[in-house]
């Protein structure tokens, strides 16, 4: 049942749909005119539309003709005509909305209309997809439509060089993943030359599977990190061994629902005995606490082949939603290292954050944002509040014929899977294709073994064989096929009855060695014949599949999010095809077990239901909906909180990145450096001169500090002589004298190096200092954020405290940038390179001005589903380095309690005022009966 907020958000929906229908009619009215155009005339439409736009016509005015041109180009190149509902979807995208379109309604084709229209501005359009394969596939297929209209397409893929990326971004429409676009934004803001930058702005983005990218992946930021000093800590391995000796419920407690562990007294004793320390509560031992908690969590909460897999000596996280391996993605706060230690693989060194941005704030950079998905309605409120995006449900082209059966609930998992296998076998026997959704790699392999015993041929699609994902999904609608997949896997590739003709045709073209990029003319010439043959074969098989009942989707467990369940169901019944879906559940499923399945258990108990008999009950259905709502609300709150804190950092990031961009684009820094010089001198005078005259000042200390800044050319005696005596010197007089001397020294420095070299030195120094100080500031802000929650104990709002202290730290950083810049400009030993003809070159070299981080050593960390971090190197290969130095450091730090706050021990236990010293031994602690805190 829709909430009040959901109903409010739907007010005006009818008016929007009427506007979209009007656009669709206007486009259809032009169809015959555009069909009559020759190919070169159709291509010339782009030139005409661009001319009209440059003369002041709006994109809204040009929409009917632009959309009609795309529809015609698609008919000619792909043999696919945009339905009216697809035209409506494209208009919704152009107007800056999320178009909610059911699976199979052709969202990839929908994007072409809005992308083409907005590319008329020549400002670049970005189409964001969920993985590299889809980016490459869509740019290849839809690129044929755009080429027919005289537009270019590009694709951003992991491992491309900066030159390749720059070329792809220069295209009219560029496809790629959210991670690649975000990392390029961060890299551009670490560039040392304008020529190193690859992106050309953020004008219009179309986000495919928008709920997956903007909701599911929005909890953790994109991070570029580089090696920090220090080695991987031996404590991870020590505590991994120790955790295996601890017993659950005896030495520690586990709360699976909250994902927390609590260490009990006997556990603390064992830790102290193992480590040979007297008291874990002593401040010197507090860094060990995070290692202990992480080791226990790695053992108790993270299961191999469910939460992660171990391949080639590396721990790889499995996406809880899709079952895919999240390439290199990492858990934060030392959890990933703890799992590596638990599994006996190499524990990698941690990294330091160099640049970071959340997906929310990256996508807010776009002047206009839009998206497509089949399941956005449940998150409509969050889309509106975070991104100012409305959700517009687009009608289906044909009425939905899928039958969604009621859930069947069994007492235990074995009984459930036995019935699942029976159901699959019956469907398989009559030729009906079956898609089975499981929640983990472990479950998919378990079901696969049961099906093999039953003699049912099938394909398994999970994190361990994701390389064949698209091929498996494309064939999942064929007669008699059985596909066991982790939930939502294969998203973005249509399951068409009889097989995906498009996919099969592209594969055939590739097999013939034809490419739309390398051999575009041969590709176009062969396409129609290949596609025609494949299409005819598929159509015949599709008729048989329809007679068998269409695609049957069988879910083996409810997901914690309603959207994921709906996505699985949505694989069936595309484009008016017949289909069926059903979920099989058991009382031991994670969702039922963790979120109050008491109602279901009591119902089973009362009715004495045999193990192999299912029940259908509204009570159980309500319990499931309630559990899902709890999880969704919790996850939404996490994302909201992440955004609140990142908004503070985002304002600072915009200021720093704006400064860097102006510098790279050639702003003259001479005036700014002079301002820096004035402000630094003012700061020094503030420290050494108070109210009144010079009689009370320490001139020696003042001169000593000035000499660390620049070569002072005036002596104390000369200044006093100029004034007459110390008593006649005031701050304004001193300021004039010192600034005059400093400017003379700067002018002398410039004359010795040459004006051109000095301007280049200013640019290099300012960039170098900004980058170094910004990197340190990110570390400090991470540290501040991790400890700021403790302020709540002093009745203070952590967010307000974070804003206040973050601003103070930013001001400190800006002061340090000014002071360090002036110090470097005066004191660096600089070598000016001369050109062969003797003309002065602007190239300067100085120690400390080289780029601090080699591209090859950087790591690229992307957002995960539960705050984990994806880490890759420059070539796109998996890395296992820690996300940031601050995470480890802050987890080991203990914040001092605020004045008046309740004091806490190392494990968070209360310490009374009379007892604020740490207990001397275990007996003393037991006597005090101190409780432990959950972590």
From Swiss-Prot:
It comes from the Bacteria. It catalyses: ATP + H2O + cellular proteinSide 1 = ADP + phosphate + cellular proteinSide 2. CDD domains: DEXDc_SecA, SF2_C_secA. ATP binds at residues 86, 104-108, 494. The keyword Transport applies. Transmembrane segments: none annotated. InterPro entries: Helicase_ATP-bd, Helicase_C-like, P-loop_NTPase, SecA, SecA_CS, SecA_DEAD, SecA_motor_DEAD, SecA_preprotein_X-link_dom. Keywords: ATP-binding, Cell membrane, Cytoplasm, Membrane, Nucleotide-binding, Protein transport, Translocase, Translocation, Transport. Its EC number is 7.4.2.8. GO terms for biological process: intracellular protein transmembrane transport; protein import; protein targeting; protein transport by the Sec complex. Residues 879-935 are annotated as: Disordered. It is a peripheral membrane protein. One of its GO terms (molecular function) is protein-exporting ATPase activity. It is found in: Cell membrane; Cytoplasm. Pfam families: P-loop_SecA (PF21090), SecA_DEAD (PF07517), SecA_PP_bind (PF01043), SecA_SW (PF07516). GO terms for cellular component: cell envelope Sec protein transport complex; cytosol; plasma membrane. Belongs to the SecA family. Monomer and homodimer. Part of the essential Sec protein translocation apparatus which comprises SecA, SecYEG and auxiliary proteins SecDF. Other proteins may also be involved. Part of the Sec protein translocase complex. Interacts with the SecYEG preprotein conducting channel. Has a central role in coupling the hydrolysis of ATP to the transfer of proteins into and across the cell membrane, serving as an ATP-driven molecular motor driving the stepwise translocation of polypeptide chains across the membrane. This is Protein translocase subunit SecA. It comes from Leifsonia xyli subsp. xyli (strain CTCB07). The lineage of its organism: Bacteria, Bacillati, Actinomycetota, Actinomycetes, Micrococcales.
């Amino acid at each position: 049942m829709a909430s009040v907020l959901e109903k409010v958000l739907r007010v005006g929906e009818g008016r929007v749909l009427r506007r979209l229908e009007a656009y669709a009619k206007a486009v259809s009215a032009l169809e015959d005119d555009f069909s009559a155009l020759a190919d070169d005339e159709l291509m010339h439409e782009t030139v005409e539309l661009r001319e009209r736009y440059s003369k002041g016509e709006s994109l809204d005015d040009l929409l009917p003709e632009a959309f009609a041109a795309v529809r015609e180009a698609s008919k000619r190149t792909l043999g696919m005509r945009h339905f009216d509902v697809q035209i409506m979807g494209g208009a919704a995208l152009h107007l800056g909305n999320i178009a909610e379109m059911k699976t199979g309604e052709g969202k990839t084709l929908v994007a072409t209309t809005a992308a083409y229209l907005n590319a008329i501005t020549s400002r670049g359009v970005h189409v964001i997809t969920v993985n590299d394969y889809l980016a490459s596939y869509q740019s290849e297929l839809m690129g044929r439509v755009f080429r027919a209209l005289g537009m270019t397409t590009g694709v951003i893929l992991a491992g491309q060089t900066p030159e390749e990326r720059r070329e792809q971004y220069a295209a009219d429409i560029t496809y790629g993943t959210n991670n690649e676009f975000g990392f390029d934004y961060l890299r551009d803001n670490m560039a040392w030359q304008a020529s190193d930058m690859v992106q050309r702005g953020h004008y219009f983005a179309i986000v495919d599977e928008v709920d997956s990218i903007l909701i599911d992946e929005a909890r953790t930021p994109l991070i570029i990190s580089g090696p920090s000093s220090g080695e991987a800590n031996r404590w991870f391995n020590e505590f991994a061994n120790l955790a295996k000796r601890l017993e659950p419920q005896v030495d520690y407690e586990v709360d699976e629902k909250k994902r927390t562990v609590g260490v009990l007294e006997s556990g603390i004793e064992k830790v102290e005995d193992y480590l040979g320390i007297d008291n874990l509560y002593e401040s010197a031992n507090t860094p060990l606490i995070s290692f202990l908690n992480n080791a226990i969590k790695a053992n108790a909460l993270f299961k191999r082949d469910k939460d992660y897999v171990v391949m080639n000596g590396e721990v790889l996280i499995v996406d809880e939603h899709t079952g895919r391996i999240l390439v290199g993605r990492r858990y934060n706060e030392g959890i990933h290292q703890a799992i590596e230690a638990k599994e006996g693989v190499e524990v990698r060194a941690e990294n330091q954050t160099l640049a970071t941005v959340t997906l929310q704030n990256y996508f807010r950079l776009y002047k206009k944002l839009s998206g497509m998905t089949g399941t956005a309605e449940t998150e409509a409120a969050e889309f509106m509040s975070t991104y100012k995006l409305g959700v517009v449900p687009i009608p289906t082209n044909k009425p939905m014929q899928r039958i969604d059966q009621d859930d069947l609930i069994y007492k235990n998992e074995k009984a459930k899977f036995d019935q699942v296998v029976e159901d699959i076998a019956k469907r398989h026997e009559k030729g009906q294709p079956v898609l089975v959704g499981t929640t983990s790699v472990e479950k998919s392999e378990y079901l696969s073994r049961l099906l093999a015993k039953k003699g049912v041929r099938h394909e398994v699609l999970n994190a361990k064989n994701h390389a064949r994902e698209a091929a498996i999904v494309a064939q999942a609608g064929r007669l008699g096929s059985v596909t066991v997949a982790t939930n939502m896997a294969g998203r973005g590739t249509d399951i068409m009855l009889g097989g995906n003709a498009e996919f099969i045709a592209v594969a055939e073209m590739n097999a013939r060695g034809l490419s739309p990029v390398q051999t575009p003319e041969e590709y176009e010439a062969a396409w129609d014949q290949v596609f025609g043959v494949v299409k005819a074969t598929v159509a015949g098989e599709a008729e048989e599949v329809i007679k068998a009942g269409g695609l049957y989707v069988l879910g083996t467990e409810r997901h914690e999010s309603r959207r994921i369940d709906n996505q699985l169901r949505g694989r069936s019944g595309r484009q008016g095809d017949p289909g069926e879906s059903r979920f099989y559940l058991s009382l031991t499923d994670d969702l039922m077990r963790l979120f109050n399945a008491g109602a279901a258990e009591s119902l089973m108990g009362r009715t004495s239901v045999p193990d192999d008999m299912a029940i259908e009950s509204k009570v159980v259905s309500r319990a499931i909906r309630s559990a899902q709502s709890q999880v969704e609300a919790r996850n939404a709150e996490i994302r909201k909180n992440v955004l609140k804190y990142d908004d503070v950092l985002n304002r600072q990031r915009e200021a720093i990145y704006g400064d860097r961009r102006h510098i790279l684009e050639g702003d003259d820094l001479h005036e700014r450096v002079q301002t820096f010089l004035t402000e630094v001198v003012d700061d020094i005078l503030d420290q050494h001169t108070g109210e009144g005259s010079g009689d009370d000042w320490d001139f020696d200390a003042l001169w000593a500090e000035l000499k660390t800044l620049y070569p002072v050319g005036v002596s104390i005696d000369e200044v006093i002589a100029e004034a007459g005596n110390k008593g006649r010197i005031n701050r304004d007089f001193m300021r004039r004298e010192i600034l005059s001397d400093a400017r003379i020294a700067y002018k002398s420095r410039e004359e010795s190096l040459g004006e051109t070299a000095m301007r280049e030195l200013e640019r290099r120094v300012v960039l170098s200092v900004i980058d170094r100080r910004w990197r340190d500031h990110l570390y400090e802000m991470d540290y501040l954020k991790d400890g700021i929650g403790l302020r709540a104990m002093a009745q203070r709002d952590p967010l307000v405290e974070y804003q206040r202290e973050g601003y103070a730290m930013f001001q400190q950083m800006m002061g340090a940038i000014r002071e360090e810049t002036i110090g470097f400009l005066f004191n660096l030993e600089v070598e000016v390179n001369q050109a062969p003809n003797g003309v002065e070159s602007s190239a300067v070299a100085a120690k400390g001005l080289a780029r601090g981080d080699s591209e090859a050593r950087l790591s690229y960390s992307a957002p995960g589903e539960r705050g984990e971090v994806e880490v890759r190197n420059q070539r796109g290969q998996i890395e296992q380095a820690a996300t940031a130095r601050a995470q480890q450091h802050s987890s080991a730090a203990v914040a001092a309690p605020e004045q008046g706050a309740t004091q806490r021990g190392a494990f968070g236990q209360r310490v009374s005022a009379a007892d604020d010293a740490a207990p001397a031994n275990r007996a003393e602690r037991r006597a005090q009966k101190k409780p432990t805190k959950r972590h």
